[in-house]
């Protein structure tokens, strides 16, 4: 659908009562105003572009790769799951810059968080911590990431840091993603 262009009417200045320099200046102003009226975009400023639509084919590929990785994780094929989450992350990060960045952030944070889960299952705790940290930098209200970060810290015997991560998660995480954090906090308070 082509946008309808409205015609711009150049204002007219009555210069019949002017003399000398005023007359010359008035004519120049009139000529300039008329010339602007002929431009498609006055002052050479085009209208804003419509919002970009996300590449749905890429979203489909990312989701299929994530589902395949989730299935591998359920079958306890953690190395395969880690690799597939990494590939899905690469796909998500290959979005064009004009696409909505919120979609890239959402997909990337989920892939990093899921890869952290696979790394925890593989006892690759520093890698899991790095992925959880990266996911939280992208999306700081993602409760599962706080949980995974705390579990990685706990596995590395950094209990006080893990407790602080759980506290932070309980404050910052979305309510729907807090359940695991509540259970983890309960387990920490029972030990004390």
UniProtKB/Swiss-Prot annotation:
Keywords: Cytoplasm, Nucleus, Protein transport, Transport. GO terms for molecular function: Hsp70 protein binding; Hsp90 protein binding. GO terms for biological process: post-translational protein targeting to endoplasmic reticulum membrane; protein folding; protein transport. The keyword Cytoplasm applies. Its main location: cytoplasm. It is found in: Cytoplasm; Nucleus. It comes from the Eukaryota. This is ER protein translocation subcomplex subunit sec67. It comes from Schizosaccharomyces pombe (strain 972 / ATCC 24843) (Fission yeast). The lineage of its organism: Eukaryota, Fungi, Dikarya, Ascomycota, Taphrinomycotina. The gene is sec67.
